[in-house]
């Protein structure tokens, strides 16, 4: 399971310079250059999506649910008291793929906002669990990008490239929802709104992130 998760980050590594380039081009590049960068990003996301599906080859649902998940579920409220350390309960969310900077970085570059969905507050909170340099990278891109602003007033070609990039991320998140069902919901026999390892409502979080990604698409204008 963890090998497959690392595989997603490995597949996404070549996109880091693409994100940096697209962010820079959004400030002073041409529409054609920015469209090309977004096209490269969309192509790279195909490999990231394929890497996510490898989890089915590396770990079966029963093994994950019964032998892995109990140890990464975390301990939110009421927390756990560490004897000899503190009398106050320690509260920590469990291991979650949302703690990877990868997808948050992609959202930041494209200007995808999750504030209107429950996913937003959780995604912001888990940044505290990222390695500091990763968190700073996400913050820098989020503050420096003008991609969505440029696309809104850009050419049809640029808008189409942007929407294709969004569609690839949405497809990734849709695949993630299917995995969550097969690896958590189905083995538990529970309703879809059970909590994930991060402590959030699983179905609400995943569907919210997918919806805000899809909703970010821009209707192409008639500009050539």
Where do the protein language model's features map onto the residues?
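Surface-exposed peri-terminal alpha-helical interaction modules
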Residues: 1-224
């Amino acid at each position: 399971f963890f090998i497959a998760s690392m595989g997603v980050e490995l597949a996404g590594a070549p996109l880091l310079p693409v994100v940096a380039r697209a962010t820079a081009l959004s400030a002073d590049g041409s529409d054609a250059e920015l469209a090309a960068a977004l096209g490269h990003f969309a192509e790279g996301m195909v490999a990231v999506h394929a890497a996510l599906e490898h989890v089915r080859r590396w770990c079966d649902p029963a093994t994950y649910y019964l032998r892995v998940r109990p140890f990464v579920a975390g301990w939110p409220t009421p927390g756990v008291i560490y004897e000899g350390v503190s009398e106050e309960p320690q509260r920590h969310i469990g291991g979650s793929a949302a703690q990877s900077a990868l997808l948050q970085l992609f959202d930041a570059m494209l200007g995808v906002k999750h504030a209107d969905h429950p996913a937003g507050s959780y995604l912001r909170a888990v940044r505290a669990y990222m390695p500091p340099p990763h968190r700073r990278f996400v913050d820098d891109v989020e503050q420096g990008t003008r991609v969505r602003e440029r696309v809104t007033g850009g050419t049809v070609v640029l808008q189409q490239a942007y929407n294709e990039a969004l569609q690839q991320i949405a497809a990734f998140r849709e695949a993630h929802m299917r995995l969550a069902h097969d690896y958590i919901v189905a083995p538990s026999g529970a309703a879809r709104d059970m909590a994930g390892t991060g402590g959030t409502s699983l179905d609400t979080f995943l569907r919210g992130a997918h919806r805000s990604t899809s909703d970010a698409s821009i209707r192409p204008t008639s500009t050539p």
